[in-house]
Swiss-Prot record:
It is a peripheral membrane protein. Residues 198-283 form the KH type-2 domain. The keyword rRNA-binding applies. NCBIfam families: era (TIGR00436), PRK00089.1 (NF000908), small_GTP (TIGR00231). Keywords: Cell inner membrane, Cell membrane, Cytoplasm, GTP-binding, Membrane, Nucleotide-binding, Ribosome biogenesis, RNA-binding, rRNA-binding. Coiled coil: none annotated. This is GTPase Era. Belongs to the TRAFAC class TrmE-Era-EngA-EngB-Septin-like GTPase superfamily. Era GTPase family. Residues 154-156 are annotated as: G5. The keyword Cell membrane applies. Residues 7-175 form the Era-type G domain. The lineage of its organism: Bacteria, Pseudomonadati, Pseudomonadota, Gammaproteobacteria, Enterobacterales. InterPro entries: G_ERA_dom, GTP-bd, GTPase_Era-like, KH_dom-like_a/b, KH_dom_type_2, KH_sf_prok-type, P-loop_NTPase, Small_GTP-bd. GO terms for molecular function: GTP binding; GTPase activity; ribosomal small subunit binding; small ribosomal subunit rRNA binding.
Amino acid sequence: MSEEKSYCGFIAIVGRPNVGKSTLLNTLLGQKISITSRKAQTTRHRIVGIHTEGEYQAIYVDTPGLHMEEKRAINRLMNKAASSSIGDVELIIFVVEGTRWTADDEMVLNKLRDGRAPVILAVNKVDNVQEKADLLPHLQFLASQMNFLDIVPLSAESGMNVDTIAGIVRKHLPEAIHHFPEDYITDRSQRFMASEIIREKLMRFLGAELPYSVTVEIERFQTNERGGYDINGLILVEREGQKKMVIGNKGSKIKTIGIEARKDMQDMFEAPVHLELWVKVKSGWADDERALRSLGYGDDV
């Protein structure tokens, strides 16, 4: 009796910052593995999300947003991580936002024109477009820019038409053995996911100025005798004023961040979590390429 066929391939999700790439990945997977925020540049590493359904395994790479600004070392490394994802995949999902088209979108498109992989254009946040009459002409404009495999208007947040994207992906997966066991949803370690959860809470609860000058290092990640995890997180900021902002009045802000992060970790790890957070000033970390690599920012480039 012949063996059943299996299909497997890598799909890059690309686009400028803040178009909803991470939300789309989370919706495609049916659960949250990539951090989301209304602020741009929330994704700093390439996150691999794995969706297995029967004989099909889609391995999604959620890239940092590509953007023109490369003054700081962290921006250069993020652009390098995003660009390197484009070259070694079977399929690309190019995410744009509603009827907006910017110089950063154009830059991403130019990179995709040079690539070999077919491109699905995902026009996200169409439910937020105020003038619906503008949508069709804009879709026609987009269609003229490149020979896309398909163009799908969708809402990653509500889930509208995300199943259409998943269906197109399945159709174009090459015949291959699965790279991961069927119960895997990411190749990232629990330690890494813990740092991402803390970073998301920092994004959510702090002002607009801070998040790009903050990163998280997990100094301790151990199982305990209660069957749970003891986790110590170090929050690095660039200035003393930022440290005060993270801690908040009488420690109120860092307490809220810790409580919310612990809840998400317990949901993700399905075990009790004891979380302790500290804040430390490390000036210039976002401009120091060696420091960035020591924090894991160059690992996937």
